[in-house]
Amino acid sequence: MTPALPTTTTQVQQGRLGRLVVARLKPNEDVIDSAEALCASHGIACAVVRGGLGSLIDGELRYHGEHGHQAIHVPGPGIEILSLSGEVIAGRSHLQAVLADADGKLFAGCLQRGRNLSFITVELTLQEWLPD
């Protein structure tokens, strides 16, 4: 018997894109916390992550697998961010990433809040989302 897939809720929202914020994180800054702080400092309630790159001390991801939520620890230092996308909303941000370790092994999942600290630098591009 095939296990039942989790029920998901999809929300469709109309709106438009607003201001663009491009920022460089300093060492030891968490990606999610920093993205939320950047938005707050510019009066942005919701933003789309247009991109991100840089390196993390360690990578901490999660994904929903066959047996519920699974964690992935990517030991560093020097974990490279190859892809970063998602949405930034104060306290509810959801960022998906593809990371590579020093051997080039790839890992994908959702960043865990407070556990993905910039190593040397991380660059983020965020764009304001203005719902109708």
Placement of each model-derived feature along the sequence:
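N-terminal intrinsically disordered, cationic/polar leader segments
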Residues: 1-51, 56-94, 98-132
